[in-house]
């Protein structure tokens, strides 16, 4: 991102000819005298997302060992406000890992909405921190917000998918990795991640600059965090973040994500068209989307019962192969491919 140079006559920082930190002293300044501002722009070799960082440090003559360490403020290209899609300003340690995200605060410079980590996840929903309003989703979404279903998901629930033709997590992961080869080294978002079954696999592979485990269910994210904490292959440097967000309002800037994965998820979304349109928006040019779901009926389903089965399952967003392709292409994705096994379908498409 192009940045205007800092001038010696003003403490304002200008980004694309707009004030970067206008009148936000209460959120980003200390109680002591105004610090000097040091600007740096950096781009990671493995990441396509440059960031602007500002370090607030005291003048050299005032530095002593007892003073508070410098405060870092960053406009990140990873997260955006789910209300206005402006990049969020971040106060705290940098990095996409559990410890850094937990210790950071986020604020939108456009609408002034603030976001912070709960005990287990960063809440980037439009309804974050609302006290009196509780949004209820369709039953297919609300089911997975249940503590019981969230607990059982990797303890028997997911294993039952094999009866519908799902190959199993290890094989599904291997298949997805084949489609994601061109996205290696970039940012991967695992939408509707559930308890993080595939998010953990993607993070453990070490092939991505960051992995975002994203779900709307608070209890699924608690399970995700618990599995990560109990896995000794993860440490504070592992590039994985746990985020609560709505798939139809993804908290990422347009064109900023290299890969999106949605395992056994499409049939749970209130509006698959809205969700896939959002996925297309956040993908960069050439970015890859891979998803799996249940078909309304399998190729082996007797023709005589297909109309009845279709009538029942269509209301729960169980789609067919041609419908999934139509939704992807109508939302701007190209190069659609799929693989079908019984009622299981893995499909992929990319942003041109």
Swiss-Prot record:
GO cellular component entries: chloroplast; plastoglobule
Transit peptide: 1-55
Stretches assigned to coiled coil: none
Recorded superkingdom: Eukaryota
Predominant location category: plastid
CDD domains: AdoMet_MTases
Record-linked SUPFAM superfamilies: S-adenosyl-L-methionine-dependent methyltransferases
UniProt entry keywords in alphabetical sequence: Chloroplast, Methyltransferase, Plastid, Transferase, Transit peptide
Plastid listed as a keyword: yes
Disulfide bonds: none
Compartment annotation: Plastid, Chloroplast, Plastoglobule
GO terms for MF: S-adenosylmethionine-dependent methyltransferase activity
Entry's EC annotation: 2.1.1.-
Any Pfam family matching the protein: Methyltransf_11
GO biological process, one term: biosynthetic process
Family named by the database record: Belongs to the methyltransferase superfamily.
Protein name: Uncharacterized methyltransferase At2g41040, chloroplastic
Organism of derivation: Arabidopsis thaliana
